Swiss-Prot record:
PANTHER family: MEMBRANE PROTEIN INSERTION EFFICIENCY FACTOR-RELATED. It comes from the Bacteria. It is a peripheral membrane protein. It is found in: Cell inner membrane. This is Putative membrane protein insertion efficiency factor. Keywords: Cell inner membrane, Cell membrane, Membrane. Transmembrane segments: none annotated. The keyword Membrane applies. GO terms for cellular component: plasma membrane. SMART domains: Haemolytic. InterPro entries: Membr_insert_effic_factor_YidD. Could be involved in insertion of integral membrane proteins into the membrane. Belongs to the UPF0161 family.
């Protein structure tokens, strides 16, 4: 019984630490199955902004993934970017929890480089 208590406490702490991440992903799920289902997909990127947000928050947590998603939403407009824009595999260099804007890519996309030089923004 005593060996079960530390494991249970660790499981509880792990579940509590995932709560913000799951709440953010839950909001995206609600958006996808309500408003987005009625209006349809109008995103200029692949993956869509809601898919990007779900993946970013799932991978990096609500704080960092939320900032990445905010920057993506700002870029997704008629005068913004378009094309392939995947969630980065690792946090960008210089990103710290107290400098949250550094998690986000505010310009450009990270699609495959075609060698033309315009992806170096």
């Amino acid at each position: 019984m005593h060996s079960r208590l530390p494991t249970h406490a660790a499981d509880l702490l792990q579940a509590l630490s995932r709560l913000p991440r799951n709440a953010g992903r839950g909001l995206i799920w609600v958006y996808r199955h309500s408003f987005s289902a009625l209006v349809g997909s109008n995103c200029r990127h692949l993956p869509t902004c809601s898919q990007y947000g779900d993946e970013a928050i799932g991978r990096f947590g609500l704080w960092a993934g939320g900032w990445m998603t905010l920057a993506r939403l700002i870029r997704c407009n008629p005068y913004g970017t378009s094309g392939i824009d995947n969630v980065p595999e690792t946090p960008p260099p210089g990103a710290r929890w107290y400098l949250p804007w550094r998690y986000a890519r505010w310009r450009g996309v990270n699609g495959p480089d075609c060698g033309c030089g315009h992806h170096d923004e």
